[in-house]
Amino acid sequence: MTTQQDLLNKINSLVDQRATVPTNPYGGQCVAFIDNVLQYQGLFKLNFGYVNAIDCLDRAAQLDLKVTRFDGSNKPPVAAVWVTSCLPYHQYGHIGFAAAHNPDGTITTIEQNIDSNADALENGGWVRKVVRRLDGDGTFSYVNWQAPAQQLIGWFELPFENTKTEEKTTKLEELDMQKEFILKNGKYGFGVYIGGKYIGL
């Protein structure tokens, strides 16, 4: 199963390249990058073909992925896929990955087709790693790149393997066992687990 680090390694490896898919005739579009990574790189089998970026939150919901809408204070977690509105410039929206949260509150993103080349809507662009600032009104602007700001709509999260969650679950189960022992034996106080058994002190 794919880990978060697997995804981050993959999207970083594609920076400055053009990511395309066989179902999109318009070259390196922003959504083609997402579809390339989520369907064709061996990480996931999530189909984001034949869809504009603006509709990807709906597609994600159809694929049973966790979808979150921007509420003025939250922000896309690392490795989430965010969606923005590009009005009034065009109605197709924009999409990319959140690659890192920075100490100054900015977000490093990896996204495609932000070079503003004249044929961007017909042939797309390249994958770029940039820094953005997210304001409370949803304005998602570039810090180190020349391109128009957009409005953040929301994001979706991917089904990663999570060993830390499994470890926490095990610890909670141990706590339940400990509580059960105390209730059955009428004992209170401290104890330890040794070899899977609870020993009262």
Q: What kind of feature is each model-predicted range?
A:
Residues 1-201:
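Extracellular cell-wall/glycan-interacting regions and their flexible linkers
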